């Protein structure tokens, strides 16, 4: 049963796997802090729209096709957010820069430690490649061995500036499968291939932590109203 909560919106640009985690949790009724949830897609026909339908989440397309359209996109986004009294925005695979909106908390999920592997240009496979490159350097310097344990992180944080450096809502370590490290170190797979495997592995943890981070962020908003 849903209690009085806030209105939230998820912004996605692609397949929406992270968005699906939040929408699925909302559908089964465990997102108690949310009174309403909407999906905002930046692309017509994006896979996230079908996932919204499957979860019975209302959706809208506010299209943005090129960097020069970003200012107008943000103007239209702000108008939609205000018209629907959205107080929390979850960035879940949005490829465009989102401008701050007054009285709206924005959160993002990052597949690593935001301080070491965050900032502008650090997204997608680039993050995992950097994590793995640093691990290879540690092995090269004989500080650790390929068979040792290594970890990365999943971080849910508030959106702010500098990029990816907003207050952390939750952060958790994720153990990197040993076979990825060993295969990369032996040259069996390339850095790109290793990063793709690590990305797939970490994604499953993102699906756990993004709904939890969304609830924590919504609770923060509700607590301020008391």
Where are these predicted regions, by residue range?
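One-carbon transfer enzymes
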Residues: 1-226
């Amino acid at each position: 049963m849903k209690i009085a909560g806030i209105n939230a919106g998820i912004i996605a640009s692609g397949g929406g796997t992270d968005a699906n985690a939040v929408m699925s949790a909302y559908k089964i009724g465990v997102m108690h802090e949310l009174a309403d949830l909407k999906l905002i897609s930046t692309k017509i026909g994006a896979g996230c729209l079908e996932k919204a339908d499957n979860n019975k989440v209302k959706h809208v397309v506010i299209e943005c096709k090129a960097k020069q359209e970003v200012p107008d996109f943000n103007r239209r986004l702000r108008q939609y957010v205000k018209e629907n009294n959205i107080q929390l925005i979850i960035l879940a695979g949005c490829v465009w820069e989102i401008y701050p909106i007054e009285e709206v908390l924005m959160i993002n999920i990052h597949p690593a430690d935001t301080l070491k592997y965050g900032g502008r240009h650090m997204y997608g496979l680039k993050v995992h490649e950097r994590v793995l490159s640093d691990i290879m350097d540690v092995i090269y310097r004989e500080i650790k061995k390929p068979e040792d344990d290594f970890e990365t992180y999943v971080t849910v944080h508030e959106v702010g500036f500098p990029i990816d450096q907003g207050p952390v809502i939750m952060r958790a370590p994720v153990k990197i499968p040993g076979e990825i490290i060993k295969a990369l170190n032996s040259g069996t797979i390339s850095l790109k291939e290793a990063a793709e495997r690590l990305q797939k592995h970490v994604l499953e943890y993102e699906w756990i932590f993004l709904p939890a981070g969304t609830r924590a962020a919504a609770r923060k908003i509700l607590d301020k109203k008391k």
